[in-house]
Curated annotation (Swiss-Prot):
Catalyzes the ATP-dependent conversion of 7-carboxy-7-deazaguanine (CDG) to 7-cyano-7-deazaguanine (preQ(0)). Pathway: Purine metabolism; 7-cyano-7-deazaguanine biosynthesis. The keyword Metal-binding applies. ATP binds at F8, S9, G10, G11, L12, D13, S14, T15, A16, C17, L18. Belongs to the QueC family. Binds 1 zinc ion per subunit. This is 7-cyano-7-deazaguanine synthase. Pfam families: QueC. Its cofactor is Zn(2+).
């Protein structure tokens, strides 16, 4: 039996991975990690929505030390001001790296993968499915092919059963992910990419701020990828 654990953080990338995994695995588990990020309550409700929508079991695990370490590093994902960028600034690599540093959570992806690996090792092995992609790999070193390759080498030694990381979006940018979401029939408007979401609409769609880098990337990817964006924004990003 082919088993996969999807590391689900609520955004376009992990939502695409969830729908993709549903097609490619016999058993799928959603794993959402809480560490006190400002979008945590919205992320959890989004996870619960897709768990019910796709009939996939969900595990939510709290990791308190990541919150403490994020505050030590000054990550804007847990406190402080969320970075705002324009669409044109997304192409300025130094500006993109600057915003990446401001929301960096110390070793987050490595920690999350380790938790998923422990779960899969206990269950007898399987794949950890992550939303790493080409666009974010340009500014986040732990979203790259090289990171996946090295983590998989470490997992050969760190687990008793066969556990590996699979990154189905690694060659795609947000435009490509948008096209994949459409192909998979995903209800992406119920996902959340915003660093500082403003709650939900009456029918359960997250309300995005429309100003943070993640909102701008989301809107650009959807509009340029499939020519539409059903996301609810407080302020629609300008492209």
């Amino acid at each position: 039996m082919k088993r996969g654990v999807v590391l689900f953080s609520g955004g376009l990338d992990s939502t695409a991975c969830l729908y993709w995994a549903k097609r490619h695995y016999d058993e799928v588990i959603m794993l959402t990690i809480n560490y006190g990020s400002r979008e945590e309550s919205v992320m959890n409700k989004v996870a619960e929505f897709f768990s019910k929508e796709l009939k996939i079991p969900l595990k939510i695990i709290r990791v308190n030390f990541l919150n403490e370490f994020s505050k030590l590093s000054g990550s804007a994902l847990v406190e402080g001001n969320v970075p705002r960028v324009s669409a044109s600034e997304l192409e300025v690599i130094e500006r993109a790296k600057e915003t990446a540093r401001s929301v960096w959570v110390p070793a987050r992806n490595l920690v999350l993968i380790s938790i998923a690996a422990s779960l899969l090792d206990a269950l007898g092995g399987g794949d950890i499915i992550v939303g790493f992609n080409k666009e974010e790999g340009e500014t986040f070193p732990d979203n790259t092919k090289e990171f996946v390759e090295r983590v998989n080498k470490a997992l050969e030694y760190a687990t008793m059963n066969k556990v590996r990381v699979v990154a189905p979006l690694i060659e795609l940018d947000k435009r490509g992910i948008a096209r994949l979401l459409k192909e998979l029939g995903a209800k992406y408007e119920y996902s959340n990419s915003c660093y500082d979401p403003k709650g939900f609409t009456e029918d359960g769609k997250p309300i995005h701020c429309g100003r943070c880098e993640s909102c701008v990337r989301r809107h650009r990817g959807l509009m340029e990828g499939i020519g539409e964006d059903k996301t609810v924004y407080l302020v629609t990003p300008k492209l």
